[in-house]
A protein has these predicted regions:
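Mid-domain alpha/beta scaffold segments of enzyme catalytic cores
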Residues: 1-176
Length: 176
């Protein structure tokens, strides 16, 4: 299986097309990556939301309307203040809007976060018991930061190769 995160309008469409070429193998996500949040972010987000809506089907569930989507998650979204805080306010607004999509659709989140954990948690706390879950991908934090993130039900940490050696020390301290 290959999970295909999107970062903007173009890739949100491209990953869906690729998933149709490789059904059962490639699984698409839809979203606006924080590094792609620029001056035109509102227009980008509206287009991505339209793409998401186009590929949602409402179905009756036991507890009301549920949604089925051609996308498996909202992602890769988040906050990234590592290189610049120029579009900080815009990133915060874009992230919160996409978290709202997760709540509305039941799609999990693929979250990218660098140098912005406090800001990310401030937004997620509003939705803590309402979100379907997801992945805090490429986690590079410490034990305390991991503990804070793992308090969110149905969320997991993704630990990538860039941070593996430092993360091994942190992971050894996690509860079994």
């Amino acid at each position: 299986m290959v999970f295909l995160p999107a970062i903007d309008v173009k890739t949100s469409e491209a990953v869906l097309k690729l998933s149709h070429e490789y059904p059962g193998y490639a699984y698409p996500m839809v979203g606006l990556h924080p590094e792609e949040v620029k001056a035109d972010w509102k227009e980008q987000l509206k287009k991505i939301e339209a793409i998401l809506d186009e590929h949602l089907t409402a179905v009756d569930g036991l507890n009301g309307i549920k949604y089925k989507s051609d996308y498996i998650a909202i992602g890769e979204i988040g906050l990234d203040f590592y290189w610049s805080r120029e579009f900080e306010k815009e990133q915060l607004e874009a992230f919160e809007k996409q978290v709202e999509w997760s709540y509305e659709t039941g799609l999990p989140l693929m979250i990218h976060c660098r140098k912005a954990q406090n800001e990310m948690l401030h937004i997620l706390r509003k939705w803590k018991d309402k979100l379907p879950g997801g992945v805090f991908h490429c986690f590079t934090g410490n034990q305390q930061e991991a503990k804070e993130l793992l308090e969110y039900d149905n969320f997991v940490l993704g630990i990538g190769g860039v941070s593996t050696s430092r993360a091994v020390i942190c992971v050894k301290t996690f509860p079994q």
